[in-house]
From Swiss-Prot:
Entry GO terms, CC: cell outer membrane; pore complex
Signal peptide: 1-21
Residues of the OmpA-like domain: 215-343
Organism superkingdom: Bacteria
UniProt GO BP: monoatomic ion transmembrane transport
InterPro entries recorded: Bact_OuterMem_StrucFunc, OMP/PagP_b-brl, OMP_bac, OmpA, OmpA-like, OMPA-like_CS, OmpA-like_sf, OmpA-like_TM_dom
Protein name: Outer membrane protein A
Function, in words: With TolR probably plays a role in maintaining the position of the peptidoglycan cell wall in the periplasm. Acts as a porin with low permeability that allows slow penetration of small solutes; an internal gate slows down solute passage.
Site (Part of salt bridge gating mechanism) location in chain: 73, 164
Keyword Coiled coil: no
Sequence repeat ranges, renumbered to this chain: 206-207, 208-209, 210-211, 212-213
Subcellular location: Cell outer membrane
Length: 351
């Protein structure tokens, strides 16, 4: 009979519904089961009549799933009430117990596994007998511990709900000298369990990082002939007016992020050293004026570039007369302002 029941359990496993989730590690579950309980090797003493060995069995269980391969379960089993009749005695036997087992499983897929449970059951067995000859009734009970072996298949219907088909065997439930029998029990059951903590945790979405400051670089070119007299580094009134117009655009500079660099350039007339010094003084004059208007002093700096980076190129190489050469090289005499940190600069001021 045991072989037949196990074969049925394996065959029915083929009809498992498609699962949606496998159990997670380190989670708890609880469930209940109902099935066919069959007693074996009953051998009631002084009974020569029929014994109803097939009964309804049920149980409840809870467990902890350590990982896909190992879990632990504790449960209560009602193994059923087995009546018997004989020419001498009529009576009944019932058994129940609390079991503790280790559950060893092997995943077939992410959602279906086979398993075995190994452990023990603390049971209580009760008998009630009526003597047909004397008319006397007698009640007895016994308690003890027996090994438990189980095997089955388990699959998930949803991430939280799982079903199992299981065959369980419990050996020697009772003392024949005390209650008149010592049967074994096989329980083929269908169970349903609820698994805690199976839902996917909502992902923690990090807030989008603040956009990086859009540091833009703007270039302004002011003609030195508008700002200064020839060969001088003192601002003319026209130059101050041009810088006033520029300041109206620079005033939106964020002092925490922005910076202004003023570059002074000269033409090639004169020595390198002289032109370097003149370019530095002119750049500093522009810086000083813009600071006086309100540009933070720690956000603006001056740099003299001398006669480097001429914009006229070779245009004036054939000009020999000094006045004409000075006029031809006028574009080289300039002040460039490089601004970082201003997003909206309208237009270049007219010099």
């Amino acid at each position: 009979m045991k072989k037949t029941a196990i074969a049925i359990a394996v065959a029915l496993a083929g009809f498992a519904t498609v699962a949606q989730a496998a159990p997670k590690d380190n989670t708890w579950y609880t469930g209940a089961k109902l099935g066919w309980s069959q007693y074996h090797d009953t051998g009631f003493i002084d009974n020569n009549g029929p014994t109803h060995e097939n009964q309804l069995g049920a149980g409840a269980f809870g467990g902890y799933q350590v990982n896909p391969y190992v879990g632990f379960e504790m449960g209560y089993d009602w193994l059923g009430r087995m009546p018997y009749k004989g020419s001498v005695e009529n009576g009944a036997y019932k058994a129940q117990g609390v079991q503790l087992t280790a559950k060893l499983g092997y995943p077939i897929t992410d959602d279906l596994d086979i398993y075995t449970r190994l452990g023990g059951m603390v049971w209580r067995a009760d008998t009630k007998a009526h003597n047909n000859v004397t008319g006397e009734s007698e009640k007895n009970h016994d308690t003890g511990v027996s090994p438990v072996f189980a095997g089955g298949v388990e699959w998930a219907i949803t991430p939280e709900i799982a079903t199992r088909l299981e065959y369980q065997w419990t050996n020697n439930i009772g003392d024949a000298n005390t209650i008149g029998t010592r049967p074994d029990n096989g329980l083929l059951s269908l169970g349903v369990s609820y698994r805690f903590g199976q839902g996917e945790a909502a992902p923690v979405v990090a807030p989008a990082p603040a956009p990086a400051p859009e540091v833009q670089t703007k270039h302004f070119t002011l003609k030195s002939d508008v700002l200064f007299n020839f060969n001088k580094a003192t601002l003319k009134p026209e130059g101050q007016a041009a810088l006033d117009q520029l300041y109206s655009q620079l005033s939106n500079l964020d002092p925490k992020d922005g910076s202004v660099v003023v570059l002074g350039y000269t033409d090639r007339i004169g020595s390198d050293a002289y032109n370097q010094g003149l370019s530095e003084r002119r750049a500093q004059s522009v810086v000083d004026y813009l600071i006086s208007k309100g540009i933070p002093a720690d956000k603006i700096s001056a740099r003299g570039m001398g006669e480097s980076n001429p914009v006229t190129g070779n245009t004036c190489d054939n000009v020999k007369q000094r006045a004409a050469l000075i006029d031809c090289l006028a574009p080289d005499r300039r002040v460039e302002i490089e601004v970082k940190g201003i997003k909206d600069v309208v237009t270049q001021p007219q010099a």
